[in-house]
Amino acid sequence: MKVAKNGSPENSAGQISREELIDHLNEDLSGEYQAIISYVVYSQVLKGAEYMNIAAELEKHAGEELSHALIISKQIDYLGGQPAVQPKPVRTSEKAKEMLQFDLENEMATIQRYRERVRQCESLGEYAMAEYIREILKDEQDHLISLATALGEDVPVVKAASAHAGK
């Protein structure tokens, strides 16, 4: 049986309460704040010709993440919750490839969470909310592709989150 962040059980279909969805969305919102900060900082500190294109792309990503934060905040308010104000911790490095790798890992985790969030919204009958999250998911997948390309890697396959993963 899956267990929600607050310790109460989720049923096998992934149905959760509105309050639990608010908790999950607030965690997502904190992740969006983290992404904004990361992309703003990384876009300015990446140096050298090999990083010019990705640095410009990261600036664009920062704006998209702000848009995501606004959408998620609006959904939390719609559900009767209070949007979070704290970002998740931002990882930094002196090495450009490490910074890009941090972002790649964050995007993979974000995609996992948003896929789960779509299922949770639909299980509560919140189909419009699920559509908003699907739109965010498209951007996050594009970010993943950009980062993998900049790192010279194949785009990683994002696996479904495990039942015990802390979302």
Q: What is each of the regions a protein language model found here?
A:
Residues 1-167:
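Iron-associated oxidoreductase/ferritin-like identity signal
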